[in-house]
Curated annotation (Swiss-Prot):
PROSITE patterns: INVERT_DEFENSINS (PS51378). Residues 23-36 form a propeptide. Belongs to the invertebrate defensin family. Type 2 subfamily. Hemolymph. Residues 1-22 form the signal peptide. One of its GO terms (cellular component) is extracellular region. The keyword Secreted applies. The gene is VSNA1. This is Defensin. It is found in: Secreted. Keywords: Antibiotic, Antimicrobial, Cleavage on pair of basic residues, Defensin, Disulfide bond, Secreted, Signal. It comes from Dermacentor variabilis (American dog tick). One of its GO terms (biological process) is defense response to Gram-negative bacterium. It comes from the Eukaryota.
Amino acid sequence: MRGLCICLVFLLVCGLVSATAAAPAESEVAHLRVRRGFGCPLNQGACHNHCRSIRRRGGYCSGIIKQTCTCYRN
């Protein structure tokens, strides 16, 4: 029983460490989300061009099924 508890605690600590390491750094977080459309999900170039038109560096389709146009910071 004691060994089982130690294994469970070890697994929980490993999960916590991996979840913390998987969090994106502040510089990797998307800075501007635009409502759905602007080419997503089928035309990522249209999203990129939209973001360029609003004076952002570029953009990409993000989300579960890539329906949200997300723009890069300047």
